[in-house]
From Swiss-Prot:
Pfam families the UniProt entry points to: Aminotran_1_2 (PF00155)
Keyword Chloroplast assigned: no
GO biological process: L-histidine biosynthetic process
Broadest EC class assigned to this enzyme: transferase
UniProt cofactor(s): pyridoxal 5'-phosphate
Annotated positions of the N6-(pyridoxal phosphate)lysine modification: K229
Keyword Zinc: no
Family under the similarity heading: Belongs to the class-II pyridoxal-phosphate-dependent aminotransferase family. Histidinol-phosphate aminotransferase subfamily.
Name of the protein described by the UniProt record: Histidinol-phosphate aminotransferase 2
GO MF annotations in UniProt: histidinol-phosphate transaminase activity; pyridoxal phosphate binding
Source species taxonomy: Bacteria, Pseudomonadati, Pseudomonadota, Betaproteobacteria, Nitrosomonadales
Length: 373
């Protein structure tokens, strides 16, 4: 009997599925733990939950569940246009920012092309390139971040996309705005630069690149953002891209007709209005980062200075020690993110939680380190 999977292209069959952070429900099933006692610090979610305004909007949107959503996302795009100072025809909505990343990839990459990203880039980038048969080029990192000069040097006539996450996930590093602007000025105009700003809301104003203003001068720039992080809407999947009108038009042509659901549209529009909630998320993260890094210092654990809502910890010794620590934390009801799929075998990524969650992690880590000895 024919194995139909063999008819798929080799590059599709070679794909390794993306591994998300372990869900709380899975840990409860596996270890029989009480759900309320589990602390999840694995997926860079907002520990404050969701904006009250967004919650109310979602409840109201449920009344229209039998209706298809507005496929154009007119009202959300209008709200984003007003907030960001961008024409609505330069905004593309997506089912999370991963969706708009994939749209750009499908348009510009093909089996004879290449995509460039950093060694420790978001794991989705190489998957997106592989899914269309393009060749991914991982440029060696510089201090766990982007080496922009090396990325420029890696550009060839076959290069169609360069991915840059700023701040970077999973390392939390940040490219200086001036360096990024000089980079954009030197990138060939026929190479699309995708600037993934999923964690932009966690940056102090002094560190923000003001990249939206660059769109006027660089037609080859696409900026992606999400409502999953600071806005606390990870489960309803809403993201967006900002691009030159011609590129946005192409992205809108190939996206699914109703790629953002009604509940997500309503929640995102309401969340945009809740400025105080986002400010609180920012301040909670700053305070939590100080608590977390102070605790790691006390334990003698090295970490990568982070501009996101997470911190990347280094566990000394053989990589097996890192897995032992990870599993021990699970036994204690604390979920963090191992980074073996990033070839960071001695690292764990930890989301910044509220004070009690951070304390719980640090106590569990201290216990795990003792048991490792």
């Amino acid at each position: 009997m024919m194995n139909l999977s063999e008819l798929a292209p080799d590059y599709i069959r070679a794909i390794q599925p993306y591994q998300p952070g372990k869900p709380i429900s899975e840990l409860v099933r596996d270890l029989g733990l009480n759900k309320d006692e589990v602390v999840k610090l694995a997926s860079n979610e907002n520990p404050l939950g969701t904006s009250p305004l967004a919650k109310e909007a979602m409840i109201q949107a449920l009344n229209e569940s039998a209706r298809y959503p507005d496929g154009s996302g007119f009202e959300l795009k209008a709200a984003l246009s007003e907030r960001l100072g961008m024409p609505a025809d330069q905004i593309v909505l997506g089912n999370g920012s991963n969706d708009v990343l994939e749209l750009a990839t499908r348009i510009f990459l093909h089996p004879d092309s290449t995509a460039i990203y950093s060694q420790y880039a978001f794991a989705i980038y190489p998957l997106l390139a592989q899914a269309v048969g393009a060749r991914g080029i991982a440029v060696p990192a510089r201090n766990y971040g982007h080496d922009l000069e090396a990325m420029l040097a890696a550009v060839t006539p076959e290069t169609r996309i360069i991915f840059i996450a700023n701040p970077n996930n999973p390392t939390g590093t940040l490219c200086d705005a001036r360096d990024l602007l000089r980079f954009m000025e030197r990138v060939p105009q026929d190479v699309l630069v995708i600037l993934d700003e999923a964690y932009d809301e966690y940056l102090p104003e002094a560190n923000k690149a003001n990249s939206i203003a660059w769109l006027k001068n660089f037609q080859n720039l696409v900026i992606t953002r999400t409502f999953s992080k600071a806005y606390g809407l990870a489960s309803v999947r809403v993201g967006f891209a900002l691009a030159h009108a011609d590129i946005a038009n192409l992205m809108n042509r190939i996206r699914q007709p109703f790629n953002v659901n009604s509940i997500g549209l309503a929640a995102a529009q309401a969340a945009l209005k809740d400025v105080e909630f986002v400010k609180l998320a920012y301040m909670t993260n700053r305070t939590g980062m100080q608590q977390m890094t102070h605790g790691l210092d006390q334990l003698g654990i090295e970490y990568i200075p982070s501009f996101g809502n997470f911190v990347c910890c280094h566990i000394d010794g053989h990589p097996a020690n890192t897995l032992k620590i990870y599993r021990n934390l699970l036994q204690q009801g604390v979920i963090v993110r191992p980074l073996g799929n990033y070839d960071m075998l001695n690292h764990l990524r930890v989301t910044i939680g509220i004070e009690e969650e951070n304390k719980r992690f640090l106590q569990a880590l201290e216990q795990a380190l003792k048991e490792l000895d």
